[in-house]
From Swiss-Prot:
Protein name as catalogued: ATP-dependent dethiobiotin synthetase BioD
Organism: Francisella philomiragia subsp. philomiragia (strain ATCC 25017 / CCUG 19701 / FSC 153 / O#319-036)
GO biological process: biotin biosynthetic process
InterPro entries: DTB_synth_BioD (IPR004472), P-loop_NTPase (IPR027417)
Family, as annotated: Belongs to the dethiobiotin synthetase family.
Gene this chain is encoded by: bioD
Example GO molecular function: magnesium ion binding
Class of this enzyme: ligase
Keyword check for Transmembrane helix: no
Keyword terms: ATP-binding, Biotin biosynthesis, Cytoplasm, Ligase, Magnesium, Metal-binding, Nucleotide-binding
Length: 226
């Protein structure tokens, strides 16, 4: 079984959009997947669930429950450590790691996706960040970058930090969902040349799950090291 942690260069860069399309591609190809969202914030307009959790469940056509994919959720769409302190909730790396391991050890899966909250160094508390969880799990990362002004710096900084701690970058996805952005290809090419990592997928505004089928197959291939 392959395990992939999905992070963004920032919040609102399309992580959940990418996650749901990967889920749909896996379902279409009969690839057994589970996508976890251990920490979520921001309540949906349509239910009591957090919006990201709701979208993941919808992508699976509700064959999983919220408790099966999410451990900690907050209705306010703010940084997790802020609302956690306000709510007196402890976001423990050990508890998150245990939640994740419990989920995949009980299932026969081809791939486990773990969708993060925001960027690599999103704080869980004043003493721990999301990166601490990734390092504890020691699993590869898929990085989602929304192509816009500033994305080159954000993407390169994230890749450099992953490399510095010997965390494998399984791939990075260019989310090109804003048709008003100029020089999209030039920005992608710059990231590729400076980082040394080829863009795994360039996703347009009208992409659907079919655009993710090849990527989903690559992610579970034996050639990809965990």
């Amino acid at each position: 079984m392959k395990k992939i942690f999905i992070i963004g260069t920032d919040t609102e860069v399309g992580k959940t959009y990418i996650s749901t399309k990967l889920i749909e591609a896996c379902e279409h190809e009969n690839i057994k997947s589970l996508c976890l969202k251990p920490v979520a914030s921001g309540q949906s307009q349509f239910s009591e669930l957090c919006e990201d959790v709701e979208n993941i469940l919808n992508a699976y056509k509700n064959k999983f429950t919220a408790d099966e994919v999410n451990l900690i959720s907050f209705s306010e769409a703010v940084a997790p450590h802020i609302v956690a302190a306000k709510s007196k909730v402890d976001i423990s790396i050990e508890n998150l790691k245990q939640f994740i391991e419990d989920k995949y050890t009980r299932r026969d899966l081809d791939i486990l996706f773990i969708e993060g909250a925001g960027g690599l160094l999103t704080p869980y508390s004043n003493h721990a960040t999301q990166f601490d969880l990734i390092k504890a799990l020691r699993i590869p990362v898929i990085l989602v970058s929304a192509i816009k002004v500033g994305c080159i710096n954000h993407t390169l900084l994230t890749i450099n930090e992953l490399n510095r701690h010997n965390i494998k970058l399984a791939g990075w996805i260019a989310n090109c969902n804003d048709s008003n952005i100029k020089y999209i290809n030039e920005q992608i090419n710059t990231i590729e040349e400076i980082s040394g990592y080829t863009c795994s997928a360039k996703i347009s505004q009208n992409a659907d799950y079919l655009d993710f089928i090849d990527l989903s197959k690559i992610l579970i291939s034996p050639e990809e090291n965990e």
